[in-house]
Amino acid sequence: MRKKTRLDRKTRGLVLVLLCIVMAAAMTACSGTSNGPEVSNKNSNGVAGGNEQGAEEEELVPEEGAKLVVWESKEQVDYMKKIGKAFEEKYGVPVAVEELAGGEQGARLATDGPSKLAADILTLPHDQIGQAVKAGLLLPNDAFEEETRAAMVEAAIQASTYDGVLYGYPKSVETYAMFYNKDLLPEAPETWEEVAAFAKTYNAPGQNKYAIMWEFVGYYTYPFIGSFDGYIFGKDNTDPSDMGLNGEGTVEGFEFLQSLRPILPMDAADVTYDVKTQLFQEGKLAMNIDGPWSVGAFKDDVNFGVAVLPKAPNGNPTTSFSGVKSYYVNSYTNYPVAARLFAHFASSKENQLKNYEQTGAIPAHKEAGEDPMIKNDPIISGFFEQFKHSVPMPALSEINAVWDPLRAAFMTIWDNPSADVKQTLDQTVATIKAGMQSK
């Protein structure tokens, strides 16, 4: 019996030791010994936060003494100052907004980032992030990745991602759609067949009356590639070694493009931005494929609406090219947690709607796009609907070797109805590959 008693005591002692080890491990795990952002249920003032911007945002705590600098373009400065003030009120972090043209921010980050002279947060168009990532200038959107992916339209996520890693906090989007003159067309045609039927009764070249126009450049003519399952580069335009411009889908799309010549009896080179803008202003052009940047040119002269592009004959929604602007965090920032918090805060549904109200920027946030303010705007809602069927314009530097040969192919195929589409595109791809190798 005594032996059994001693064994029980040893067993109990061993159990106690094991329990202590388990509890110590649990406490270590709860203490958060990783190198990630500090987690708390209080904001920078030590006050537990609400849920209006999301619970995850409230858990991150800005670094003590944090202060931020944001670069913003001229047309966005006043709006951004309001966002900075709201952020400071919520987190106790002052935000200075410095004006810098959007096209200059990436270059300035490259020169000023390593010397700690650049802004903590900046806005970049999506075709500039590849170079910035390769140079190690941007921090990934890691703390808010899951929330960002769920909240933003897919094309904006794709455009803010490089090599499988999400870096951006999408801010606004843009694509082109179809302006239509409501005095000539009370309802926008939904298919190219309907456009062709209207053109038969409306076109009068001698009077400069045309049913529809678009510029014959790669940006505006991409629908005849993407809508037919064609592509420029493989792997969602990330693999320049896989050229799809002479593939089956693109050939089908360009043959369809060639068949549309009767609805626009003009040579491709004659369809310029200035020509179609003037004709639409004069009420002679019924439909004009263009972007939101042209709204101001028409609002005082034309009773117009904006609709999605006509469906392809295969029934697919017509795929356009799009551009995306996102907030990015400078990898050299002294306050990476505060900077992440600000980028997430500024890209929220509420703030994207405020940006729309003040500047007309089209939201990248799905719920913002469905807000009555957007849905009831007959102009912006048309662009937002088309954006849902868009793909980001390729961000690879190799795309620069594509545009001129592709435009030449459009012109050959359009101006010469008997041109062999496959042979033309084979030659185009050969020219592009040669150009890529020479750079």
Describe the residue ranges of each PLM region.
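Glycine-centered hinge/linker elements that transmit conformational signals in sensory
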Residues: F198-A199, D239-A269
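Extracytoplasmic "Venus flytrap"/periplasmic binding protein-like
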Residues: A86-V153, T161, D183-E190, L279, ...
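Hinge/lid segment of periplasmic solute-binding proteins
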Residues: G49-P62, P125-A177, E187, W192-F198, ...
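Extracytoplasmic/periplasmic solute-binding protein
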Residues: Y167-K171, Y176, E194-M243, L285
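C-terminal lobe and pocket-closing loops
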Residues: W293-N303, A312-A408
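Extracytoplasmic/periplasmic substrate-binding proteins
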Residues: S73, K82-I83, I129, Y220, ...
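Conserved C-terminal helix/tail region of periplasmic/extracytoplasmic solute-binding proteins
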Residues: N51-Q53, H389-K439
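A structural signal for short loop-to-beta-strand junctions that line the ligand-binding cleft
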Residues: T111-D112, L117-D120, T148-K182, K209-W214, ...
